[in-house]
Amino acid sequence: MNSQDLKKRQEKIRNFSIIAHIDHGKSTLADRILEKTETVSSREMQAQLLDSMDLERERGITIKLNAIELNYTAKDGETYIFHLIDTPGHVDFTYEVSRSLAACEGAILVVDAAQGIEAQTLANVYLALDNDLEILPVINKIDLPAADPERVRHEVEDVIGLDASEAVLASAKAGIGIEEILEQIVEKVPAPTGDVDAPLQALIFDSVYDAYRGVILQVRIVNGIVKSGDKIQMMSNGKTFDVTEVGIFTPKAVGRDFLATGDVGYVAASIKTVADTRVGDTVTLANNPAKEALHGYKQMNPMVFAGIYPIESNKYNDLREALEKLQLNDASLQFEPETSQALGFGFRCGFLGLLHMDVIQERLEREFNIDLIMTAPSVVYHVHTTDEDMIEVSNPSEFPDPTRVAFIEEPYVKAQIMVPQEFVGAVMELSQRKRGDFVTMDYIDDNRVNVIYQIPLAEIVFDFFDKLKSSTRGYASFDYDMSEYRRSQLVKMDILLNGDKVDALSFIVHKEFAYERGKIIVEKLKKIIPRQQFEVPIQAAIGQKIVARSDIKALRKNVLAKCYGGDVSRKRKLLEKQKAGKKRMKAIGSVEVPQEAFLSVLSMDDDAKK
């Protein structure tokens, strides 16, 4: 095709994504659009078609973004090329959303006609507005008995400030309103800007590792054209590769002759080393490079850190390779090697949140067959020492000696909790119990309230979300942003087994709750750790001071069984001998700590604050 034809083709391209809160029907709507445009035959169709990971189907959530090309013949008789980029809706995967929005010009905002706007909807809409996208509101699930489309239409206008007068009323499940949505995409979403004759600039928004073809890049072509045989160059590190194949996804990968401006597709170039590519990087041609890289993504900083250790120590290298492959298409995952006296060699990993951590752990165990032990998650503290240094600490075992600490700052988040009016009391009580400071409260409509608190991230990391759902019967929705660091009265608590510190069980706790938490954890460990041949004391200590103790009684063999009657001094001699043996055993004996013990540090949180 000459550049004139390519420019005409470019005018027919529409790139859009679907944004919504969890469970508002995003993946179902994507399924209907695929059916309506006959991208997928009814024989191949299955629910949640774009959620290709087993984990996504089981949990009913979207974790990874997906990009698909569809052809749609509009009412004006022209055929348009749609690129649908599916996005996750959960707070931990905001990074995935921001990446997919950077590859689009428009976004369909799906709002549940019964539930209205939720916290996550707002967060993702603001991301879309930051990227200057054209937003098309769609009110979904209008066939539900509790649906109230007019109320939701007003909510969209009042809370978000979008004109919802032309919002499509739809039911993705029943297939109502799908055609109107497609027509609105044609009319309202702008065609991609960009120049086909300019040097190639392609934004990498995702990548996957293929054992045969190496790293496969998913790209959005912003300027220029790329075809197989071209020599491409990464703009961040200058490395060059020969393109072996370009193509698009129609969920399946289909090879093409070229990808031109406005296209969304994949590029394979025999990239063998995982570290050579980075999501957010710009690809250009080696013989005619672009002058500057595209504006990438803001790098997300991990909020939660935990240690990951293979149960079998010879799997350490396998774990490293697995983490590198996961990092390819999950750029927000960070890791570095660490060692623990209790657990051996492993990695300290940074995650965006607890669900992210959970998903990574499950993917490592399923996709790479590695059995893992995970330590309790922790956040990044700023420790100011007496010699006026500031150290960032994400691992409790790296905390400096208490005598060197001047003060400690911990991260606070601004939490937005949307909840029906009747549960406001429960939400406030929970937030206060988690050391939260009340900021403000806005009424969205007669019944729904947006409550804003400043809460320490460390309190949210454990089980805030579960507690919030149970105290509001599942009605609350929740979103948080990093706010600031504040001084707090924090101490490091060590757990001693048989007089030895177990580094992997150390955790940071607020002074106020230290005594109760210490007491609860030693009692929990007493139940979990199996009895030994000798007595094992479990102690919780802050610095040198022991704040709680519990003993696991020794298992004991009845050495008097063979003495029927007989002399008492004979019995005493046998008992003394047993006692001496136990003493010797205790001096050299080591205690096996089961995996549950590490997790019990997490779940004790609730008991401490009842």
Swiss-Prot record:
CDD domains (alphabetical): EF4_II (cd03699), EF4_III (cd16260), LepA (cd01890), lepA_C (cd03709)
Enzyme class: hydrolase
Domain tr-type G: 11-193
The protein's name: Elongation factor 4
Keywords: Cell membrane, GTP-binding, Hydrolase, Membrane, Nucleotide-binding, Protein biosynthesis
Membrane topology: Peripheral membrane protein
Cytoplasm keyword on record: no
PANTHER family: TRANSLATION FACTOR GUF1 HOMOLOG, CHLOROPLASTIC, TRANSLATION FACTOR GUF1-RELATED
Known catalytic reactions: GTP + H2O = GDP + phosphate + H(+)
Species, as recorded: Streptococcus pyogenes serotype M2 (strain MGAS10270)
Location in or out of the cell: Cell membrane
Keyword Protein biosynthesis: yes
A single Gene Ontology CC term: plasma membrane
Gene Ontology molecular function terms on file: GTP binding; GTPase activity; ribosome binding; translation elongation factor activity
Task performed by this protein: Required for accurate and efficient protein synthesis under certain stress conditions. May act as a fidelity factor of the translation reaction, by catalyzing a one-codon backward translocation of tRNAs on improperly translocated ribosomes. Back-translocation proceeds from a post-translocation (POST) complex to a pre-translocation (PRE) complex, thus giving elongation factor G a second chance to translocate the tRNAs correctly. Binds to ribosomes in a GTP-dependent manner.
One Gene Ontology biological process: positive regulation of translation
Location (main, coarse): membrane
EC identifiers of the protein: 3.6.5.n1
Family statement: Belongs to the TRAFAC class translation factor GTPase superfamily. Classic translation factor GTPase family. LepA subfamily.
Classification via Pfam families: EFG_C, EFG_III, GTP_EFTU, GTP_EFTU_D2, LepA_C
